[in-house]
Amino acid sequence: MTLQQEIIQALGAKPHINPEEEIRRSVDFLKAYLETYPFLKSLVLGISGGQDSTLAGKLSQMAIAELREETGDNALQFIAVRLPYGVQADEQDCQDAIAFIQPDRVLTVNIKGAVLASEQALREAGIELSDFVRGNEKARERMKAQYSIAGMTHGVVVGTDHAAEAITGFFTKYGDGGTDINPLHRLNKRQGKQLLAALGCPEHLYKKVPTADLEDDRPSLPDEAALGVTYDNIDDYLEGKTLDPAIAKTIEGWYVKTEHKRRLPITVFDDFWKR
């Protein structure tokens, strides 16, 4: 088995999908999890206005609405959380995503004060954060807020990770990567677009340039610029296509280097890090 085949298998990626079937699969997956643990009453997700959170949010709301109708349990709810750092540049996209998702409840938690307080506490301890590390601080603060909300609403935190993101480890460890349940796992980026199109999502929400937008010094830095490869490259790789060797090497380099992000804390029984 080649490394490409190993990666495709590990991430559950497929070269072709039926969007309607994958929508149903994700919704049923979320419903089944909640039914297994009836003490859970909410799905919680941060909405950024980008493709991934818009899709995960819509699927979550669909799952909650169906389960509420089927069980008569009106305590079930989907909570969409806006988590700006100060004022978000693409706030209108966030509002458009909320309008498309139609969540049961919307909360807004501005994380700027918490991030600055944490940064100041570290500064007083003699640690000055770099812009990159401050970006990770933002991602972790967002996740902390979501878990606090989930804790107070008997909920679970929904993640937006998918195969095209997982392969490169393009997420913050214990930040946006630290979630309870990931309904998009297995899909690549273009397949996520197919699901949103099938759901009737406004095109600008899934055709916009993907960006984590975590760094102050490089605002709205495109994911593809940070990675050195395009999502089309990554999707082609995950679909089993043959790529330029240099591009394939870059993708595989990211996969190997970020394996620790896809694992629980390393123990003496792990050896993946030795390769």
UniProtKB/Swiss-Prot annotation:
GO terms for cellular component: cytoplasm. The keyword Phosphoprotein does not apply. ATP binds at G46, I47, S48, G49, G50, Q51, D52, S53, T160, K189, T211. Pathway: Cofactor biosynthesis; NAD(+) biosynthesis; NAD(+) from deamido-NAD(+) (ammonia route): step 1/1. Deamido-NAD(+) binds at R140, K173, D180, H260, K261. The keyword Nucleotide-binding applies. Keywords: ATP-binding, Ligase, Magnesium, Metal-binding, NAD, Nucleotide-binding. One of its GO terms (molecular function) is ATP binding. It catalyses: deamido-NAD(+) + NH4(+) + ATP = AMP + diphosphate + NAD(+) + H(+). Its EC number is 6.3.1.5. Catalyzes the ATP-dependent amidation of deamido-NAD to form NAD. Uses ammonia as a nitrogen source. Homodimer. HAMAP family: NadE_ammonia_dep. Belongs to the NAD synthetase family. This is NH(3)-dependent NAD(+) synthetase. It comes from Salmonella enteritidis PT4 (strain P125109).
